[in-house]
Amino acid sequence: VIGPSAAGKSTLLRNSGLHFPYADADDLHFRGVGGTRNCDWWFSDQAVLLDTAGRYTTEEDDRQEWFSFLDMLRKERKQTPINGVMVAISVADLLTADSDSLERHIKIIRERINELMERLGLLFPVFIVFTKTDLIPGFEEFFEDLSDSEREQIWGAYLLEEGADSSPAEQFENHARDLYQKLCDLRLRKLSMQRNLERKGALYGFPDQF
């Protein structure tokens, strides 16, 4: 799991719904040891997740330490150093940063992903997760009535489907449009059930924030 500091990486894992059998209720992960901590280790029934230090994503001064960390992974797990990467991107950053800052942010994340592929010598799936979406106006009102089964579903899209004849950018745009339409369809039903005028206004405006 990579992403800047305060992007919500640990909160994402803590609320993932995964079972972490080797941790107590207050501490679900194991911290790295030594003078400089590289990552936190999250041991679940299904996977081992590495929550990397946020500075690896944003700080050029830590580049050599980042490379040493990747070399360690490749040495200890020769066949498959990692099975995939989750990139945590905070919605708070998207809402407050200017276009130049966002472009730099995206470029740095892309560089880290390229370094992972080159240093580890393999291709892997990349999952982009937008965190802190509860900061978007209307989020709480829109999703407060979800059932447990609905909360367990992933709200997103998979790009690069087999046989796709469009670019990733075009696929993203198409999927984003589909997700927006689903929000609009849900809005009609939710508005009919909401009686509080203030909450109804927030609920109505949420899809347009998307």
What are the functions of these language-model segments?
Residues V1-F210:
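Basic, amphipathic N-terminal segments
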